[in-house]
C-alpha cells in the first residue's frame, strides 16, 4: 500500500513560490542531480519544499545543520503533513565522551555516553518508516552520515507475524531475545515483553504509544491486536505485524561467530607488526583488550565498544564506507539540504576529526586498525550516495553554486509583500551613542533590536553601558545552553526586554518578527563574522518586520559590505516591483510566540480532561536544563507505570499527557 503525501495548509503558493515550485519539479523530473533554492528570509522556503515533496510524492530526507533547526523543521513538516510519516533523526546522545588517548601525558580516556531513550525510539521509528512506506519525510542532522546498522542484516532480523501462522511460543520468545528485547513481567516498557499463559505482550522498540498482543492457541497465532500499554484497552485488531530489532546494531549469531574468527586473524597479524617494531607494551595492551572483547561477544553477543568491530559485523572490506541512514533511503529518494552554506562544510569536516583521534588509538595498541572503519562518511562518499539534491539557503556557498551551475532558483519575492530591510552605513566614531538613540526610537513603539559585535568583551561592555542608560538588554553568548537560548529569544519576542546583544546572532535560525532594527558594529572589519554571507544573514533578521532596518557602522565600505548591500537592494527592488504590479500592501508577520518551542502538533493524543492540567504542570518545568528535564521525564514515567499497575488509569493517562508535552519541549531544546 503506497500512501500519497497530503499537504495541509490554509495558504496557497504566492509571490515567487509558484515559479520556484514548478522549476524545482521540472528539474527533478528532468533528472538534475543538483539544484539550489536561493530563498530570502521570510519567503516561505519550507512551504515551497513541502509543495515539491507533495507533488512528486517521493520519500525525502531533510538535512539540517543542528538539532535546534532540525526540531523547528520537524515541527513545520508535521503541521504540513499530519497524515504522513514525518520522522526525526538526530544524535541520541545527551552526553558523549569518545574514547581517546593523549600520548604526551600517557592518559587514556574511556568512552562515556548517556543515550536519550526517546530520541533512540524516534530514530528507530524513522528507519522503520523508510523500510515500510513511501510517504516519508525524515528530518535529520549531520548524524545521518554516521555509521548505522546494515539495512540488509536489520531486515533479516525482523520478526514477521500473521494471523493463522503456525509457530510455538518458545520460538517467538527466542526470536524476541535475539532482537535484544528483555522479558519484564512487572514494568512493561519500550523494548520489553511479558508472558501470561498463551498471551505474549510486546512493546515495540520504535513505538511510544501502542504495544502488540499476540494470542496463541495450540501453536497457532489466533489474534494480533494493538493496545494501549497503560490502560490495556484494545485499539485495533491487525492481520499481520512486523517486530523490529531493539537497536540498529543487532547482528545474527552466525555473523558474530564469523566476525570473531576474522578479528582473531587480524589480531595475529597486528601483533606481528607491533613486535617487529619492538612495541611490546602496545602488543600486550592490544592482545588483552581484544581477547576480553572476543570473550564478551562469545558469551553475550555484544561487547562495550562493539562499534569498533563494525567492519567485520557488516562484512565490509577495509576502507569501504559504513552503512548510514542514506542506505535506508530508497533509490528514488530526494535530499533537501537546509541552510546548505553551513551544513555542507559540516559534512566535510566530520571525517577528519574522527580519523586523527582513532589513528592515535591504533598506533598505541588500544584498538585494531579496523577501528578506523567505524567512522562517518567521507565527503566524496556522501556525494556518491546522495540522491537528487535541493540545496536551500539565503546565501548559498561556493560548492552549491558550482554544483548547480545554471540551476539556481530565486525565491526573492515574499507572499506577504514584506520588503528587505533598508540599509544605512554610519561612522564608527559615534556608533554607541547613535545606537542608543536608535534603540530608544524602537522601544517607544514596542519594537525589538538586535545588536551584533565582533568580540565577547565588546558585547559585555555594550550590554553594561546600555543597562546603565536604563535600557532592558540581554546578552547572548556561547556559554548559554540551548534551552536558555530559546528562552532568551522567546522573552525578547514577548517584550520581557527590548535589546539583544550577541556576536553571531545569524546562527539562531529562529523567526523574530518583532525585530525591526539590526545594528552591526564594526561592519568594516573584514573576516568571517563580516563576510558577505554573514552580513546578508544578519541583515535578514530584520526582514520579517514592516519597519525593518539595518545599520552598518563602518568608516569605509568594504567589498563584502558593498556586495551585501547590492544584493539586499536587488531583492528589495524586485519585491517592490512585484507589490506594485499586483497591488500588494506589505503585511507584518503575526507569528504566535508559542510556535518557537512547538514541535509539531501531537495528533489526537491526550484529548480530554487531563490535557489542561498537563499543560499547567509542564509550565513549571520550562526553565529546566535538558539533563534535568530528561531526569524529570524518567521520574514521571516511573510514577505512570505505578499508577497503571494499581489500576489508577485516569492518573496514569494524565501523567502520560504531561510526559508527551515534556518530550516535545526536550526535543525542541536539546
Curated annotation (Swiss-Prot):
| Span of domain Helicase C-terminal | 431-597
Q: Helicase ATP-binding domain: which residues?
A: 26-183
| Molecular-function annotations in GO | ATP binding; ATP hydrolysis activity; DNA binding; excinuclease ABC activity; helicase activity
Query: Domain notes, please?
Result: The beta-hairpin motif is involved in DNA binding.
Q: Does the keyword Cytoplasm apply?
A: yes
Q: Which CDD domains match?
A: DEXHc_UvrB (cd17916), SF2_C_UvrB (cd18790)
Question: Which species is this record about?
Answer: Serratia proteamaculans (strain 568)
Q: What sequence ranges are listed for the domain UVR?
A: 630-665
Purpose: The UvrABC repair system catalyzes the recognition and processing of DNA lesions. A damage recognition complex composed of 2 UvrA and 2 UvrB subunits scans DNA for abnormalities. Upon binding of the UvrA(2)B(2) complex to a putative damaged site, the DNA wraps around one UvrB monomer. DNA wrap is dependent on ATP binding by UvrB and probably causes local melting of the DNA helix, facilitating insertion of UvrB beta-hairpin between the DNA strands. Then UvrB probes one DNA strand for the presence of a lesion.
Family to which this protein belongs: Belongs to the UvrB family.
Q: Which domain of life is it from?
A: Bacteria
Span(s) of short sequence motif Beta-hairpin:
92-115
Positions in coiled-coil regions: none
Keywords attached to this entry:
ATP-binding, Cytoplasm, DNA damage, DNA excision, DNA repair, Excision nuclease, Helicase, Hydrolase, Nucleotide-binding, SOS response
Where in or outside the cell it occurs: the entry states: Cytoplasm
NCBIfam families linked to this entry:
PRK05298.1, uvrb
Q: What is the lineage of its organism?
A: Bacteria, Pseudomonadati, Pseudomonadota, Gammaproteobacteria, Enterobacterales
Q: Describe its partners and assembly state.
A: Forms a heterotetramer with UvrA during the search for lesions. Interacts with UvrC in an incision complex.
| Annotated Gene Ontology cellular component terms | cytoplasm; excinuclease repair complex
Q: Under which name does UniProt file this protein? A: UvrABC system protein B
